[in-house]
């Protein structure tokens, strides 16, 4: 029996220089071997620093694994070091492929007139985004208004609710470079004080983010909800359509809750 292929060929750990030898102690406690670093492969790492290591020779029954320091991340107590360790420990993709970067660079900075074809114009509807205080990208927006449902004696109060999500599909098509990178990532990864986006920043924080006071392409679910009767609070009719919107405000959960509790007045 022999090992055909090993999954781990890169890892993060502490660089130690003791008794004339340089080793890296892996951050991942499931890895029981320390990595021996030849003098020519330390990359200037100092004792105690956190480093990223590339495994050059896997361990055998009689020898330790050999590696080279590919990157010196810094001191263990540097601000944000826990994030740098997590990114490498879990192999979170940080850099986009060259093809994806080139494709993103070719996209426009703003919504063009040609993009509006076959879209409902909702730019006058006061849609708003509601997110956390530290959010940088805004994926969805909402608008709700009181309406009268039915006619004549069958009139009853209700609500019209619009939920709009950024129409990423207008810019990212199946099988293109941006799509390939997005599939590899699967999702944006959120750390305290840092986000590793699924798409390049020009899209994640730009064209595909419903920023205030700019036009954005969206997919909308337009719903009708009775306020009274047996179906009160239930969606009784809905339709989906492509639209263009213009966010009227970037709000947060905190100030919306405060407004609902009438603790403060905010302009929306």
Regions found by a protein language model. Give the residues of each.
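Conserved, carboxylate-rich catalytic/transport cores that coordinate ions
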Residues: 6-265
